[in-house]
UniProtKB/Swiss-Prot annotation:
Positions bound to Zn(2+) 2: C243, C246, H265, H269
Pfam families named in the record: EF-hand_2, EF-hand_3, ZZ
Disulfide bonds: none
GO cellular component terms listed in the entry, alphabetical order: plasma membrane
Protein name: Dystrotelin
Localization terms from the record: Cell membrane
GO molecular function: zinc ion binding
Chain sites annotated for binding Zn(2+) 1: C228, C231, C252, C255
Renumbered zinc finger spans (ZZ-type): 223-279
Length: 653
């Protein structure tokens, strides 16, 4: 190292930063920051996985391996490797581990030194240390590797040779304290890798220079857009130190390490080290944190006081040219892969025999803040009471909310039940409506079938016998005037026949008055056909009445003995007459039962409030029924009269 540069670095008050700056200079000079721990292990331990870790190596062999190491580093890195880098590195390693000049070095300390000065993150270096020094079990299982107290002591002792080569020596006492803190609470003889990494990341004092050197290398090109409050430099390049007590107070790296401060800022204030550029949000949070620190604190930072006292004790062991260093520092560095860095104090509290009582000045400062602490505690109790009150109110509101929610759920369930009932009723009513409509259609079909002309299965003898029985016997036997028969046939109330013109005119009047055609009305052709069928028996009757003289002549020519009808023939006629009367009574009953159904069907189709239209429609349908009955009478009367006429003519002949 250049003596002038070394003299400049010796003016740094804090020993940790002084050691880190010196090692950073050596690292840059030898270009060791271009290496990585994986490549170092691959070159130095190539083909020696089964050999002992205590293997020695000569200086010539070490030089060849260093040349190969830098050659492979230059191939994988864009930076140009200096030709003298292997020589400088060999000289550095010999100054560390071969002070007697024997020319023989151990591989394990050499590899640990190269890993410590490489460019990897601290966590990667800690893993490499464990792999180099951990003792494996008899089966050679790497997952069961352990680090014992003896191995950890050897590791820390070898790593202590690195700051010693730059004039920063450490005693053996911090090593024993570090071992005690690492194995605190451990009952076994060794620890696993997770426990070792957790302890190393807590930054023990003996290894504090290693993460500090990494932060210095990471912040060399970082620019902070703030102005130094001491030298007024803008922007700050490198490390930035922000006071957590003073408002908007930033110090550059040079002013902080030189011990330059303003009157408003004291050295006892806690400062935070920034290795990366902070965003506007983080700066705002930092400002609020400073405001919070200016308020009365809950308790005295005894841990910070102890760390400050520890730094004073360490500074007293330095050379006489260095003054006492007092620092309480927090830092923020970039998170390297696998390395979880947090804001914490750079100097951790020492354990074991180094834990002594602080100075009387610090105790007086503690007494001055005693009353303030008591007041803050009282205020804290009042705040807790208020918080408990708020919690009780919160529980009450939650109970009310739960009660209202239950009521709402009950109302919702009731509404759902009512909706289900209504839907069931709607379905039932719809089903009933469909059934009624089906019944109505069936009744319409039945009515249409009954209004059709009578099928041949119905016997016409019933009506004929009834008509024949209703005639006066004396008129037939005496051959009286047939006008009586004609009157009974045409003037009877149930056998009244209408002319074709009257029926057609009445049908047209009904259709014009109702405004719509009847759905079940028969066509006009069927009505005319039925009218023609009615005229046929009328013509036959007129022919019978038109020839009374011939009939009388035939009657006068019959002898008295032949006019008498036998008693057997009369008894058979009476039986036929009684059967016909029974059938007529059954037909009358069927017609009387059909009439109410017909009226009900008409009532279902008729809309409310339209009584005239309903009357006209009912009148039209009644006409259809009358016409159908007329057709039925015509079909029955004609064959009956023909049969009776043949019966009457038989005895006469």
């Amino acid at each position: 190292m250049d003596p002038s540069k070394q003299g400049t670095l010796n003016r740094v008050e804090n020993s940790v930063y002084r050691t880190a700056f010196k090692l950073r200079s050596v690292q840059t000079l030898c270009q060791l920051d271009l290496m990585d721990s994986f490549l170092i292990q691959q070159v130095l331990w190539r083909g020696r996985s089964g050999e002992s870790t205590e293997t020695s190596i000569s200086v010539q062999q070490l030089f060849q391996e260093l040349r190969e190491l830098f050659q492979r580093t230059g191939m994988g890195n864009a930076a140009q490797v200096h030709p003298r880098a292997p020589e400088l590195t060999l000289s550095l390693l010999m100054a560390m581990f071969d002070r007697t000049g024997s020319g023989i070095l151990k591989r394990q300390p050499v590899a640990a030194a190269l890993v410590a000065l490489s460019g990897d993150s601290p966590l990667t270096k800690y893993r490499a240390f464990f792999q180099l020094y951990a003792e494996k079990n008899r089966r050679g299982d790497d997952s069961q590797a352990r680090m014992t107290r003896r191995v950890l002591r050897a590791l820390l002792t070898d790593l202590q040779q690195i700051p010693t080569v730059v004039g920063e020596s450490y005693t053996l006492r911090p090593v024993e304290s570090a071992i005690h803190s690492c194995f605190r609470g451990v009952l076994s003889s060794g620890i696993k890798e997770e426990k070792f990494l957790s302890w190393a990341q807590s930054e023990p004092l003996v290894l504090l220079w290693l993460p500090t050197c990494y932060r210095l290398s990471a912040a060399e090109t970082v620019t902070h857009p703030v102005r130094c409050s001491v030298c007024r430099t803008f922007p700050i390049i490198g490390l930035r130190y922000h006071c957590l007590k003073c408002l908007d107070f930033d110090i550059c790296e040079l002013c902080f390490l030189s011990g330059l401060h303003k009157n408003s800022h004291e050295k006892s204030h806690t400062v935070m080290e920034e290795c990366v550029q902070m965003s506007a949000t983080e700066n705002t949070k930092l400002l609020f944190r400073s405001l919070r620190n200016n308020l009365p604190q809950k308790r005295q930072r005894v841990g910070a006081v102890g760390r400050q006292w520890l730094l004073d004790q360490l500074a007293s062991r330095d050379s006489a040219s260095h003054g006492p260093a007092r620092l309480c520092l927090q830092y923020k560095c970039p998170k390297a892969p696998g390395y979880a860095s947090s804001r914490r104090a750079v100097e951790t509290a020492a354990t074991g025999v180094l834990c002594q009582r602080p100075s009387p000045a610090l105790q007086g400062n503690h007494n001055r803040h005693g009353q303030t602490i008591v007041n803050i505690k009282n205020e804290l109790w009042r705040t807790r009471d208020s918080l408990n009150t708020l919690l009780r109110e919160r529980r009450l509101l939650r109970k009310q909310l739960h009660r209202y929610k239950q009521k709402l759920q009950g109302t919702y369930a009731l509404q759902e039940e009512q909706n289900c009932r209504f839907e069931t009723k709607i379905r039932e009513l719809t089903t009933n409506q469909d059934n009624l409509w089906t019944k109505l259609q069936q009744m319409r079909r039945d009515l249409q079938a009954m209004l059709q002309p009578l099928h041949p299965s119905s016997s016409p003898q019933t009506t004929a016998s009834k008509i024949f029985h209703s005639l006066p016997d004396d008129g037939i036997r005496r051959g009286g005037d047939s006008s009586h028969i004609k009157r009974v046939t045409r003037d009877g109330p149930e056998w009244e026949l209408l002319p074709n013109s009257a029926k057609v005119d009445r049908k047209h009047k009904c259709q014009a008055s109702s405004g719509k055609a009847l759905p079940d009305s028969e066509p006009q052709e069927i009505i005319l056909q039925s009218t023609r069928k009615q005229n046929h028996p009328q013509k036959m009757l007129s022919k019978v009445h038109s020839s009374p003289s011939a009939h009388q002549q035939d009657t006068l020519q019959i002898p008295p003995t032949e006019v008498k009808i036998p008693a057997q023939t009369l008894s058979a006629g009476k039986e036929m007459e009684s059967c016909s009367e029974k059938r007529n009574n059954l037909e009358d009953e069927e017609l009387q039962a059909l009439l109410p159904r017909l009226l009900d069907a008409f009532d279902l189709d008729s809309p409310t409030g339209l009584q005239p239209l309903m009357d006209m429609e009912l009148y039209g349908r009644a006409q259809q029924v009358c016409r159908a009955f007329s057709v039925l009478v015509d079909q029955i009367t004609l064959p009956t009269w023909s049969e009776e006429e043949s019966r009457l003519k038989g005895p006469l002949v």
